[in-house]
Regions:
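HDAC/HDAC-like amidohydrolase catalytic core signature
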Residues: 1-177
Length: 177
């Protein structure tokens, strides 16, 4: 299974961030898969067309400290984004960042990132049922317990795994081996 939601943007230019993350990697890969003579006609069998959930605050608390999650849902969010994406250099100058060119505020990134976390949760849940699922929007695995790192504000992989792990514990009634 492949989770690819074409409505989900991958770039960050609308936030004024000039880090070259291109939508084309996902869209071109998807286009090549659907153009494949064997895979294309069977796209309905392997393509999940939309991310159906967003990560929630309680999901974030499975992988991040309460203090960090509170900072993300407060006026400190913009400072966390600036630090995580290294948008100001050691001399206090903008680095790969042009706020004048932004069409959206930096703080609007959180909603987009929460949808990506939800996509990773959905992909992991799908993989449990089908044996495999690749999600074009995931992989924010550098974020730490109490801070974002390496252009990753949240650790979607750990959040998803811990959410699914908690679901397994709840459903089975005992701790699995």
């Amino acid at each position: 299974m492949i989770l690819y939601d074409p409505r989900q943007p991958h770039g960050m230019h609308e936030f004024g961030i000039q880090i070259p993350v291109m939508d084309s990697r996902a869209s071109e890969t998807y286009a090549r898969l659907t153009a494949h003579p064997e895979l294309g006609p069977r796209a309905a069998e392997w393509h999940l067309r939309e991310v159906r959930e967003a990560g929630r605050r309680e999901d974030l608390l499975r992988a991040h400290s309460c203090d960090y999650v509170q900072r993300l849902f407060s006026s400190a969010l913009e400072a966390e984004i600036v630090r995580t994406f290294e948008l100001i250099d050691v001399h206090g100058r903008y680095h790969r960042y042009d706020p004048a060119g932004a069409t959206l505020p930096l703080t609007a990134m959180l909603d987009r990132i929460l949808v990506r976390v939800g996509g990773t949760i959905q992909a992991c849940r799908t993989a449990l049922g089908s044996g495999f699922c690749f999600y074009f929007g995931g992989g924010m695995h550098h974020a730490q317990w109490d801070f974002g790192k390496g252009f990753c504000l949240l650790n979607d992989v750990v959040i998803a795994l811990r959410k699914l792990q908690a679901g397994l514990l709840t459903e089975s009634g005992h701790q699995p081996n």
